[in-house]
Swiss-Prot record:
GO terms for molecular function: 3'(2'),5'-bisphosphate nucleotidase activity; inositol-1,4-bisphosphate 1-phosphatase activity; metal ion binding. Gene3D superfamilies: 3.40.190.80, Fructose-1,6-Bisphosphatase, subunit A, domain 1. Adenosine 3',5'-bisphosphate binds at T139, S247, K250, R264. Mg(2+) 2 binds at D134, D137. The lineage of its organism: Eukaryota, Viridiplantae, Streptophyta, Embryophyta, Tracheophyta. AMP binds at S247, K250, R264. It holds the Pfam family Inositol_P. This is Probable 3'(2'),5'-bisphosphate nucleotidase 4. Its EC number is 3.1.3.7, 3.1.3.57. It catalyses: 3'-phosphoadenylyl sulfate + H2O = adenosine 5'-phosphosulfate + phosphate; adenosine 3',5'-bisphosphate + H2O = AMP + phosphate; adenosine 2',5'-bisphosphate + H2O = AMP + phosphate; 1D-myo-inositol 1,4-bisphosphate + H2O = 1D-myo-inositol 4-phosphate + phosphate. The keyword Cell inner membrane does not apply.
Amino acid sequence: MPYEKELAAAKKAVSLAARLSQEVQKSLLQSDVRSKSDKSPVTAADYGSQAVISHVLERELHPEPLYLVAEENAEDLHKNGAEEFLESITKLVNNALASDDSYANSSLSMDDVRKAIDHGRSQGGSSGRHWILDPVDGTRGFVKGEEYAVALALLVEGKVVLGVMACPKLENHKSSSSGCLFFATVGEGAYVQSLEGDSHPPQKVQVSNIENPEEATFVESSHKPIPIHSSIANKLGIKAPPLRIHSQVKYAALARGDAEIYLRFTLKGYREFIWNHAAGAIITTEAGGVVCDADGNPLDFSRGNHLEHKTGIVVSTKNLMPRLLKAIRESIEEEMLLSETQLKL
């Protein structure tokens, strides 16, 4: 199997990070949620998860240099007043590492943790190898005790070749244990196993085989509804209410056939970060799905930290994609026409 060593390292890293995040979520208080410079929420789990994954990848793949494109950095952890927070993060990191026998004697200092977090400052690109990480994707859901993902992917020469995603709050259909670990390698299919690593072997996942769009289900965020989604659903004749899920867990739900359509249309000028889509995209693609922009072009992860695409992200099955793209084009044209009419009034 290609990238066998990398996949094993990624699964170990993500599993340990998920363990850390679960411990934080169990005892999380609103006072534990901080704001970054861009006003988005961040918790000890975001920093701790990134530190664990950075440390495990560096150790498991030594002597290969680690280039990590990740959401967090340790800038705020160097500021006055951050020492107590950093100390709690360091304790979480060491507890998570100690839960794995091969890391039982691997104790990190506060400075080690900051350095591990700051490995995530790589800019990615079209050459070399870059790991892409969202240490806690869906922090808003995480702080409410709801779904979130720990999402890691490997970019080689500008192409995503491997993805691992922990979904600690997603029900496992094949096991009584909670939590799922999804993984995929290019050309090898997508799989899911229990996050707790029980005796059940990994199961191959496949997207839904529904051919009639009227029978399809949207998967959407738990935030407010987006009007264009309703327009597209009406054109396809979809009657079922959407499945509401936070974060990249939406990709996982679609990959195993829980839903058939995931759309992401953001405000004009917003640029998508690659760590919000890389792992989910390859898992869904390897499960037989299609991930593209609203023009039907594949997503390009080789342009640095951001995706360079024109309009929206569209995820669905091969059966439904042609009719879905047609409905999207018609809905966008109608929206533009309505905007032009309102401007003239």
